[in-house]
Amino acid sequence: FKSIINYFPLEYKKILPDGKRLGIKISYIEQDKPRGLPDAFILGEKFIGKNNVSLILGDNFFYGQYLSERLKDSVKLSKGAKVFLHRVSHPERYGVAKVKNNKITIIKEKPKKYISDLAITGLYFFDNKVVEFAKKLKPSKRGELEIVDLLNKYKKVNKLSADYIGRGG
């Protein structure tokens, strides 16, 4: 299983140079300019290989009851993608997901009209088809590949699931 951390790569390199002290191997690939989160998968194609992968946004802190167990379960994901959601007061500030009968029915980035109060946290797990799906994305109006568009590709083929992060405790 591989992980991609997308944000502040130089700071991470200083703190965790190669991972040897932790008994793991860490590799770094940097985007030369902002092209969106899914671009990390395209850049990391050789690194990912046939492995499943996680994407962790490095400017977030994740905690919550039973989070370790949920992460261990998520690493076992064999097909599809999983996002972690958290209830928020101002969903218009986040990418959000609407869930019905344990299925994600809508994913939207910073919706102007209320859809749901379940924010996408920046903690994702993907099968190795993520590179293939990312390569098929078209840049948004911002000129970047959007994570919401990638998640919608998985939703379209019925391979997107969600888990929840509650308050710590």
Regions found by a protein language model. Give the residues of each.
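Conserved N-terminal catalytic core of the sugar/cofactor nucleotidyltransferase
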Residues: 1-57, 62-69
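A conserved hydrophobic position in a structured secondary element of the catalytic/binding core
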Residues: 7, 99, 125-126
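Short, conserved catalytic or adaptor-binding loops enriched in Gly and charged residues
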Residues: 17-23, 98-99, 153-155
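Short coil/turn connectors at secondary-structure junctions
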Residues: 23-25, 49-52, 77-81, 93-94, ...
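Catalytic-core segments of class I nucleotidyltransferases/pyrophosphorylases
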Residues: 54, 68, 72-75, 103-169
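A secondary-structure boundary/capping signal
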Residues: 57-58, 84, 126-127
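Conserved donor-nucleotide/metal-binding helix-loop-beta segment in metal-dependent transferases, i.e.
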Residues: 64-92
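Ligand/cofactor pocket segment of small-molecule handling proteins
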Residues: 89-93, 98-102, 110
